[in-house]
Amino acid sequence: SSDLVFLDTIEAIHKKRSDIQFVIPAANEHRLVQIEAFLAQSDDAQSRLPIHITTGTARDAMIASDVILLASGTATLEAMLCKRPMVVAYKLAPLTYKIMQRIYKAPYFALPNLLANDAIVPELLQEDVNAENMSNQLLGFFESDNSALISRFTELHHTLKCDADKT
């Protein structure tokens, strides 16, 4: 499941960089309880790893973050507007993926890439969604100058605001 691969990614990053803290935003108290239960069942991950679960807006967690790992969707747009480097990972059921391959012809699936019409953030799909790939991509942001990416996010944000003003 994607929950396990995200947790495996945290473990892989922690092995290489024990100074990095991890934040998991919970949409509400019910989700908080679910996340805590999942982590407890996962070899008590929360006590072994520097994981902090927050409630409230995901936006606050994004702003507090250096890099973000997320599944595709509107959260990618929010991360872009917060000007945070991100890795977008998405895994569909095999049959759903086969159907989508026939129907969906856009070159990208992450909203920032679709808006830019360019691969500005890493997209991992299906078999590429694994802890090794995700941890390497995320750690890469810590070792890079991300100013060009942030500038691109700023341009896209401006374009969105201008387009919104025209309607």
Show where each model-derived region lies.
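Nucleotide-activated sugar donor-binding and catalytic core shared by glycosyltransferases
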Residues: 2-167
